[in-house]
Structure formats: C-alpha cells, structure tokens
Regions:
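Glycine-rich phosphate/diphosphate-binding loop of Rossmann-like nucleotide-binding domains
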Residues: 151, 158-176, 228, 234, ...
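Adenosine-phosphate binding glycine-rich loop
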Residues: 231, 235-236, 359-469
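A conserved regulatory-domain signal marking ACT and ACT-like small-molecule sensing domains
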Residues: 1-93
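NAD(P)-dependent Rossmann-like dehydrogenase/reductase catalytic/cofactor-binding core
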Residues: 2, 9, 55-58, 118, ...
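Rossmann-like adenosine-cofactor binding region
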Residues: 309-378, 384-385
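Flexible, glycine/charged-enriched surface loops at secondary-structure junctions
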Residues: 40-43, 80-82, 183, 210, ...
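Glycine/serine-rich phosphate-binding loop and adjoining beta1-alpha1 elements at the start
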Residues: 79-262, 463
Length: 480
C-alpha cells in the first residue's frame, strides 16, 4: 500500500480562466499525475481570469514534478509560483527566544538588567546552587549533535542537521514545557565534542545528545556524564529503548507470555539496538539474541568492537549461531532497528506461537505490516500510518521533565525502566489489544505520567536533589 508523505503539500498559485471547464481540466491533470487537490483558495478575480492558490498533496518529488509539468501543459493556465508547505514552515527557523517579563519602564530595566541584576549574580556567585532557582538552568536542555547520523539521512553535517534539532527543541517545549536549544557542533572528534559540551554546560539543566553516529555516541555519552552533575541522555539510544520496552510489556500481556520467558531476537548493531538489549536485560528478559549482517553475535567469534564483545558476553545465553532466519526459529519476539525488507513471511512462520514483531526501520520497515499480518499476533513499526507506532516522543519529554523537576544528577537505568512502565500503564487492561499496545504520542497523559515516575525513581535511587510532592494533582516541590 502506497502512503503519502505526511506534510508534503504544495501550494501552487495559478492564473486561469474563470470557467468551470478550466478548473475541471486542472483537476484532471493533477489527478492523472498522482496528486490530490486538498484545497482551492481564491486570491483575485479579474475580467477574464482568476488567480487561485491550489493546495496539492504529493507522495514524492517525482509526483510533484509530474504535477507541475501536467499543469504547465494546460492551455489557459499559467503557473505563477510553487511553494512547499514544509519549507514554508521552516522559514527563518522554527524556534525563538522570548522574554518572560516585559521591559517597558526604567524600573523593569533595572530589575532584569543593570543595576538590579548584579545582586542576583552575586547571590549565585556565593551559592552556585541558586542558579537552578534564578536562571533558565532549571528548565533548559541542550540538544547537541555533530550531524553524523541524522534520521535516515546519515552524515549530513551540523548545518544540515539544524532543522532536525530545531524540531526536537519544539517538541521539548510543546510536550513538556522545556526550553531546549539546538547546539550543532562542527567536529567529529570525540574529545572535542566532550570538551565543548562540558564547557557550555553551566547554563543547562540537562544534555540531550542527538543523531551522533555509533560507536562514538556511547563513549561521548559516558564521558560527558562522568564530568557533569546534570542528566545526560543520548535519545537515539535510550528514548527508543524505553518505548520499545513499554510496547513489549503490553504486547507480552496480549499474547499471555511472561517477559522473563521470552526469546527476543534483536536485529541492528547501532545505538538503538544496543540500548534496547540492555533495557530488556534490565527488565528481566533472559534470552536476547543480537543479530547483525553476518548473523547471530556469539561467544565463538572474536570482535574488535568492544560493544560487540559486550553483546557476545551478556546475551545469546544458548550461544546460537546462524543467520537471522535461522535464529528466528522458535523465537517469541523480533525487534528490528536495522534495514528495510530483511524479513520474509517464511521467517515469521518459524517463530513461536503468537509472534510479536517490532519492525522499526524507517521509512521502510524490516517487513511491511500488510505482508506480516497473516503470520503475527502483535505488529509495531516506527510509522504513523499503521497501528502501534513506536516513537521516542513518548519518552524523552517526560524523562527530561521528571529529571529537571527533581533536579536529578544523572538518568539511571531505574529511571528509564520507570518511564517504560509508566508508558505501558497508560493503556488499561480493557483497552489493550493487538493493535493497541502503545499510546499515541498525542495522549496528554503520557508526559505527566512519565515525569512523575522518573522523579520518583530518581528519589528512590538517591540521585534527586529536589524532593517532589507527587501526589495526584500536586505540583509542589521542596529543595533537599
């Protein structure tokens, strides 16, 4: 089934005859080229012609070009301009910095800047902890990238990564009211990245690492967290892993299996795959089998990469060997964070009863849901046009909201497990089913539930520096 790219719409300004016949020809030309007319807005009316803005949805650049050429061939129609609504949304960037207090009088100015601000600065100099109370630090997160692993685009560099980082900052604000700012670094050197983050950290309450390629991302996260006393999280690893675990908790309940008894095959050697395996093990899943292009990672092989060595030593308890297809025999769960179309229907038929398949390669999953449907009980993807979308937007806003609120010094495994449990618990026993194992990213209950769970876990583990009153409806906190 073909699917239109979300948000890919063109606004085409046309001068044309004012007859219905002319518009009918236009509609036919657009439809024949593969476009869909969503809206028509009149801009001006002349004696013999009208100017209209026609909004057209297209599935690809090829369809967009075909629509344009079809219109240009029409007699009596002049294509004045074409605008892409996605590009229009990015004009001038997508985020701004706005003051919380208006500055309209000398009194206002003296409070927010000189001379009054000097007293605030001296108070922080005397007690640096006051920065959490008196500056943006209490609610700010740096979204840091080097542009080496951006979405499915790969190494496109820091400047091209900026629109993605701006979008991430928008989501922080929209979903969790966190003030996030994009930091796009023009270096791929691990040491330089770490030093830069450490030096800019004083004004931030948390660090979100984003779209940094593996295996460098593991080392960068570890080194930065060792040197800072604020939470640091590589979202591509841990946000994804948290949501996968949340979905698996509910999927296991749907098929009536205990998490501890599952055999889970994980395909994907990048950041998300490694973090997912660690989360599964931390939750009690005992049999996790990692697979890369060469087959199952096992203890019979020697690996130059320390992360592969870790996988060999801590997973695949029966030391299975063979291809993905071979190790899927008898498996309960397949989790793919790898490449498109690597699974076949016959692979799914080898799995245990009521297979669970999370195929999350984007935009094309390891197997399409309509192909897998006859052979699986629960199916999830990373796409929004099928049920059970695994999207880390369910995790990172609430995780950072909770960490900032309790002033956590680190994001622990316990806090991430608490986040996964909170996401899973949004869906009740009555609601849970094969096509509903993970809530929508727009479910307004998610962020608050995750934040409360994360803050409570931080307090329990002794990494919270602020005690929250987390009773239902409470929003109070007391410094510890």
């Amino acid at each position: 089934m073909a699917s239109l790219a979300i948000g890919y719409t063109l606004i085409m300004r046309l001068e044309m005859a004012s007859s219905m016949g002319a518009f009918g020809s236009l509609a036919s030309a657009v439809g024949d080229a593969g476009g869909i007319i969503d809206a028509v807005d009149m801009r001006s009316v002349g004696k013999n012609a009208v100017t209209r803005d026609v909004t057209v949805t297209v599935a690809s650049d090829a369809v967009a070009n075909a629509v344009r050429k079809s219109i240009e061939r029409l007699e009596g129609v002049r294509l004045v301009s074409v605008s892409d609504s996605t590009f229009l949304a990015h004009l001038g960037g997508k985020i701004t910095v706005e003051p919380k207090i208006p500055v309209k009088t000398r009194t206002d100015l003296s409070k927010v800047y000189t001379p009054g601000v000097a007293r605030v600065s001296l108070a922080i100099a005397a007690d640096p902890a006051k920065a959490f109370q008196l500056t943006i630090k209490r609610n700010s997160v740096a979204v840091v990238t080097d542009g080496t692993a951006v979405l499915g685009l790969g190494d496109i560099g820091p400047l091209a990564a900026a629109p993605v980082m701006e979008g991430k900052c928008m989501l922080f604000k929209q979903f969790a009211d966190i003030d996030a700012f994009p930091i796009c670094l023009d270096t791929k050197d691990t040491g330089e990245i770490v030093e830069t983050i450490v030096r800019i950290a004083p004004i931030f309450g948390g660090i979100n690492l984003e779209d940094i390629s593996a295996p460098r991302c593991f080392e960068i996260e570890r080194l930065v967290q060792e040197r800072l006393d604020i939470p640091v999280m590589h979202d591509d690893q841990h946000g994804t892993a948290v949501v996968i675990l949340a979905a698996l908790i509910n999927a296991a309940r749907v098929v009536g299996k205990d998490l501890r008894d599952l055999t889970v095959v994980v395909a994907g050697s990048g950041a998300a795959g490694t973090a997912t395996m660690k989360m599964l093990l931390a939750k009690g899943v005992r049999d996790v089998i990692p697979v890369d292009r060469a087959g199952a990672i096992n203890r019979q092989e020697h690996y130059d990469n320390s992360h592969w060595t870790w996988r060999a030593e801590h997973t695949n308890r029966e030391n299975r060997r063979g291809s993905l297809s071979e190790v899927l025999k008898g498996a309960d769960v397949f989790i793919g964070v790898s490449a498109p179309n690597i699974l076949r229907p016959e692979d799914l038929q080898r799995m245990a009863r009521d297979p669970i398949v999370f195929a999350m390669a984007n935009p094309t999953p390891e197997i399409m849901p309509d192909v897998a449907a006859p052979f699986v009980t629960v199916m999830a993807t990373g796409r929004s046009d099928y049920p059970n979308q695994v999207n880390n937007l369910l995790a990172f806003p609430g995780i950072f909201r909770g960490a900032l609120d309790c002033r956590a010094s680190v994001i622990t495994d316990g806090m991430k497990l608490a986040a996964a449990d909170a996401i899973a618990a949004i869906i009740t026993d009555e609601e849970r089913g094969p096509e509903y194992v993970i809530p929508s990213v727009f479910d307004t209950r998610v962020v608050d539930a995750v934040a409360r769970a994360v803050a409570a876990a931080a307090a329990e583990e002794g990494v919270a520096r602020r005690q929250l009153m987390v009773a239902e409806g409470e929003d109070l906190a007391a410094p510890v």
